[in-house]
């Protein structure tokens, strides 16, 4: 497929996402809102976009106010829709839930509508990350040449739909991106970097090359069977824990955007019990279960690369 055809498909798919999101928000407003609870988080400024989040103060919104915030959030796709001071790199998150009363027919209609939106979002992400054939650093420029100001993460984010929950509880999750690597895989990556000399502020080209050579030597000195692990921290994430009484099971969802809960009164479902979201405080985290961590030694800090001792 030619680059021109891909751009045409990219623009066409994005227009469909916008149209279907507009139709969904109109459709939801035609349904009876049983309960709504969302939690706005402080905006991240451009100056603080890389700073660690040690505390997060939560503001609760209820009812129609919560619904209005949520429906606007679903369609928040461009930086032009937000404050000039707000970071365009930090994700805009609005955890919470909207609960709507449905019958069998309207439940199926909304399920199909949301499934279609999620399919389009997945297709759009595939075009950008795979079909474009571009490295991650070049994708930003390519996408924004055709869709100026697009917040790609918001375009990729799918909507979470649940049916007839009994209880919904919110909380925070601290996670790491973990990837296991062999010594030879890391050496191969470093070789590629060494073969393409460049400067990386605050280092000059020569200083960066020397730094890479030292890293290569450190990895090469390890036994071939050494167990290496990238363990990169991810900023704390809001989550929702959903309890289904009939199935007697709990399901956990990431909750960067309000969940849509359909309550089917034809089947006798009732309004769920919805909890709040506490302020986040990194110094006061209580772990339900924290397994014994494997002893790791940091070997390349910039890559968050560790070796198992």
UniProtKB/Swiss-Prot annotation:
It comes from the Bacteria. It is found in: Cytoplasm. InterPro entries: DNA_replication_term_site-bd, Tus_dom1, Tus_sf. GO terms for biological process: DNA replication termination. It holds the Pfam family Ter. GO terms for cellular component: cytoplasm. GO terms for molecular function: DNA binding. Keywords: Cytoplasm, DNA replication, DNA-binding. Disulfide bonds: none annotated. Trans-acting protein required for termination of DNA replication. Binds to DNA replication terminator sequences (terA to terF) to prevent the passage of replication forks. The termination efficiency will be affected by the affinity of this protein for the terminator sequence. Belongs to the Tus family. This is DNA replication terminus site-binding protein. It comes from Salmonella heidelberg (strain SL476). The gene is tus.
